[in-house]
Amino acid sequence: QRSLVGSEMCIRDRSYVIDVYRNPEMVQKNLFNLMLYVSFFPQLIAGPIIRYNEIAKQINNRTSSIEKTTEGISRFIRGLTKKLIIANATGYMADSIFALKITDYNFLVAWVGAIAYTLQIYYDFSGYSDMAIGMAKIFGFEFNENFNHPYSAKGIKDFWRRWHISLSLWFREYVYIPLGGNRKGKFRCEFNKMIVFLLTGIWHGANWTFVIWGLIHGCLLYTSPSPRDYAASR
């Protein structure tokens, strides 16, 4: 089982190192500002994964107001409600069902467990992101959104544009594009996507379950039509 905090910090800090390697002029010479970025607690637990160039200008040019503070508190409370009330309740339900003996399962119980777990992971993860965005706003920072109603997606491609957006953008910028993106033909493009989802699975957990999970999502991404295909068929 991975450490969520450690994995978030690892790829976030690595993005800074890679960006500085690509462009040495963006190095932060002020140690306090760099440590503020590295240790800024709202984003430590579960994102959003903030790249340094997204927050650098805000460090010395933050603006605070009663309106922003109120919005931040409201957003934090919304995230806390998601986590404590919805995620914990559905998580308890899912754990109780998954703890049953196989002989105690039936079609309905299995589906209730699957749906409960599906709701738990969304409200848990998005709740933490809401709390992070809210706390950041209280301190005068603006974080990008991390979830955009992923369960209303029209397909797996649309889903990954809505789910943990900052993670998808990170892998796009630091893995997919450096591998060649879509510039070297369709086969290479799909191969690069498969590598991205393999690494995404490993990021979620260093065991074969998540490796297989990543490969399945990579295969689904390859075989699924895009939202534009849905629109064209209407």
Question: Locations of the language-model features?
Answer:
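Membrane-embedded transmembrane alpha-helical bundles that form the catalytic cores
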Residues: G6-S224, R228, R234
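Cationic, low-complexity basic patches in intrinsically disordered or flexible, solvent-exposed regions
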Residues: R2
